[in-house]
């Protein structure tokens, strides 16, 4: 069933590259645009961040190995609520168990901001999720940008509780 989902959705994503002129980092990413995208209507966006085993893999491999992005682009989910799906493809581990981070995370946020400018994305309905490294990255992003995401789904991750202090009274 998982492989069927991947096979049915992976080709619905486009593979893009963003060049961060500020820090020189290039970031590949997968982007799903709702099938009947209408620029006069605003859409939610879900950012899915895979675990560290995806680091260094191609955009296509990330979609073929993991279904965290694919599930949101499935016909069933899109029928319920058409949405954009953004899946950054990191060339390295972007956060580790000692809470060290990569500047690729900053570039992913720049891509997200650019997508919100390029498309009619409802900035009050931007979500993040991911497992393991993806969860940790989502936690980190919530600590840096506590008002960026409407909600987050954290799966199998951890983060330094002191860094998360700004989120203490926020409903995630």
Model-derived regions: residue spans:
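Conserved hydrolase catalytic core segment
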Residues: 140-150
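Extracellular/periplasmic catalytic domains that process cell-envelope and extracellular macromolecules
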Residues: 22-24, 38-42, 77-81, 121, ...
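The feature captures the conserved acid-bearing segment of alpha/beta-hydrolase catalytic domains
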Residues: 150-172
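Active-site machinery of serine-nucleophile hydrolases
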Residues: 45, 49-107
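A domain-start/cap signature at the N-terminus of enzymes
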Residues: 1-44, 129-133, 141, 153, ...
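Extracytoplasmic/secreted cell-surface and envelope-processing proteins
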Residues: 55-57, 94-98, 135-139, 159-164
